[in-house]
């Protein structure tokens, strides 16, 4: 089975700013060159970048400490130190960043066109002694230390971004439908929980459009309380533009399956109540399936109901059109309830977090009494 990691804890820290330099201008025929100490370079930032070709967080499982480079110290002749290299952490689309201590939402990559975000800024470089020159103090022998970097423990949670998410009991035909439309090679077998991790596939329509389909493991009764695979994979459906409820028409519980699935989804998150949906009756080629499909349509007259058979290729064209309509219903919407309800205020709240507070020694001066080398 392919490795699928959707949650991981990582420690990130930005770079420290370089120290300012104590130096003086020493040139021929310039007896009083004055101070010429350069400023320290700024520390590197911690940047999270979305990459569309990634689907899991397995690359963060074994390397969980990420540090940006420190800024270089200033030098003589007013030469500034180089900025430290940024630490760029690649992420798949749909990730949610939380503070591991306060559980504050730091950033939510639920937006469809989001690229990268700077989570921690590097420390500022210290001033060289050139900044302390004046008519009274013409040869200052002090410089500022660089600002220390910031550090945080971040909980990274992946929530798959898709246009249509498949919801159903085990063995409802979700994987077979995904394989037919997208050639995703999801495993199919006649026993429950054949699908144990989410699978994504791209449905390419005749007019050149792409519709992303997501298949998650089957949902059991009381799944919102931890039964079966429980809550672990229900979160991946929160970002889907629409939901396809797959109902096995040969199951004796078929007429009650939709209510059961809705109950579990609503108990997990109220965001599911407003999502566009379509009911898909599967295994239409089995006995008594058509009668069950008619009863299902009578029970839910306000919801679109489709009947399909992957084995006989029945009703698949109509279902493809329904998937396109679901994708259009959520087009342009921000598929993240966390981002809508919570403003991205972490950039302004950093100094209030004890982890990110500036230390007391920032701005301290360094004199020659500390045996600091003077550069000419």
Curated annotation (Swiss-Prot):
Residues of the OBG-type G domain: 162-328
Domain of life of the native organism: Bacteria
GO biological process per UniProt: ribosome biogenesis
EC number(s) recorded for this UniProt protein: 3.6.5.-
InterPro entries: G_OBG (IPR031167), GTP-bd (IPR006073), GTP-bd_Obg/CgtA (IPR014100), GTP1_OBG_dom (IPR006169), GTP1_OBG_dom_sf (IPR036726), OBG_GTPase (IPR045086), P-loop_NTPase (IPR027417)
Class of enzymatic activity (EC top level): hydrolase
Co-factor requirement: Mg(2+)
Residues that coordinate or bind Mg(2+): 175, 195
UniProt keyword terms in alphabetical order: Cytoplasm, GTP-binding, Hydrolase, Magnesium, Metal-binding, Nucleotide-binding
GO cellular component: cytoplasm
Residue positions binding GTP: 168-175, 193-197, 215-218, 282-285, 309-311
Compartment(s) of residence: Cytoplasm
Boundaries of every Obg domain copy: 2-161
A Pfam short name: MMR_HSR1
Single GO MF descriptor: GTPase activity
Main location, first listed in the record: cytoplasm
Keyword Transferase: no
Subunit composition and interactions: Monomer.
Protein family membership: Belongs to the TRAFAC class OBG-HflX-like GTPase superfamily. OBG GTPase family.
Main function: An essential GTPase which binds GTP, GDP and possibly (p)ppGpp with moderate affinity, with high nucleotide exchange rates and a fairly low GTP hydrolysis rate. Plays a role in control of the cell cycle, stress response, ribosome biogenesis and in those bacteria that undergo differentiation, in morphogenesis control.
PANTHER family found in the cross-reference section: DEVELOPMENTALLY REGULATED GTP-BINDING PROTEIN-RELATED, MITOCHONDRIAL RIBOSOME-ASSOCIATED GTPASE 2
Protein name: GTPase Obg
Species of origin: Treponema pallidum (strain Nichols)
Name of the gene: obg
